[in-house]
Amino acid sequence: MKNFMDENFLLQTETAQKLYHEHAAKMPIIDYHCHLIPQMVADDHKFKSLTEIWLGGDHYKWRAMRTNGVEERYCTGKDTSDWEKFEKWAETVPYTMRNPLYHWTHLELKTAFGIDKVLNPKTAREIYDECNAKLALPEYSARGMMRRYRVEVVCTTDDPVDSLEYHIKTRESGFEIKMLPTWRPDKAMAVEIPADFRAYIEKLSEVSGIAISTFDDMIAALRKCHDFFAEQGCKLSDHGIEEFYAEDYTDAEIKTIFNKVYGGKELTREEILKFKSAMLVEFGEMDYEKGWTQQFHYGAIRNNNTKMFKLLGPDTGFDSIGEFTTAKAMSKFLDRLNTKGKLTKTILYNLNPCANEVIATMLGNFQDGTIPGKIQFGSGWWFLDQKDGMEKQMNALSLLGLLSRFVGMLTDSRSFLSYPRHEYFRRTLCNLVGKDVENGEIPVLEIDRVNQMIEDISYYNAKKFFNF
């Protein structure tokens, strides 16, 4: 029987162990997509408790706690103490066995705090106090955590109207780790509620200094903000979409639709889809002009629980995997940009694992030989960000594309304790490839090439792909 979470955790063969310890583990971290709060990095935030750094904003844990019968006030309540919330989480942890939360929890305790104990109600107080004592030390600040995990670059997720003041402050402070913005313009194409859209466009006008009364004005304002993001080191965009939009439309139609929604009138379903289709193309062209990488996270059904959405807002644990037939629209959208000669580097993330092979084969349609892996299959996202999901994503990519050109892992997280997800990914990768070597499916004579592939997927591919 193997020990739980020892140095060879998840590494089932000798080859896997060598690949991880001698190659993957030595690589720095490039976290090219995350949801860290930039101000916390700029101010080098000090965490007052383990609850703040671990449970604050973590909808994965909240979902598990609710499922375990924990009252909402212990998840998101304002009048509940940090200890009370942590105690309820500790009571829940033993019930998360076989859920990735069980592994993440103990990997984070071990790598951040040097704690090998299993978290449960009996150990909760001891672990809580020990972690809180360490969090009071300077090296456990926000920046300290990033240094601890040898982070080299992080890319936050930012709206076009953001001032990026905290990115600027961080850079000017001389902090050695790069914190770069990512362009996330979802609100500029969210035309379902006219009043919300108009309020956003008015904010865009204020920030850009461009008076907006037409569609062309809006695009000019967005381009000005896009230029500003580029000046601040932005290399990527990101789009959170239910599905791909690729309706046929004319420029005149889009201008009319803009006037209608900006004037406060509700759009038809057809008009909404046409507008979103046009905006995806506009954004794609902007990114191409600057050599950015565009990312698409698609396939989530969000805010399913109306009651809790009204109470807590979005991103609080009430989203799930959607079922959309989007392959044709995805193809049409990519082809539309490619036909114009304006298809930039692209990463596609699916939330429904049924689409793994769809994406893995879609990539090959638009690789053009200009750079290795120009169109990428993103690492297992959200509900798929776990051992089984990672393996399935990498197996599909291996069978139908080139795993060796994969840009690898990202945290997609709001937490400064989530960097061990890179370790979890690297161990899973090394175990997958190591088994192939041991089984004679990859020649041991090519072990130097295998070693390099592991280092590339862990670090070098991303560094080159994003020009960091």
Please place each PLM-identified region on the residue numbering.
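Metal-cofactor-binding active-site regions of metalloenzymes
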Residues: 2-290, 342-344, 348-353, 360, ...
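Residue-level detector of anion-binding/catalytic polar loops
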Residues: 293
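Catalytic core of soluble alpha/beta enzymes
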Residues: 245-260, 278, 296, 300-344, ...
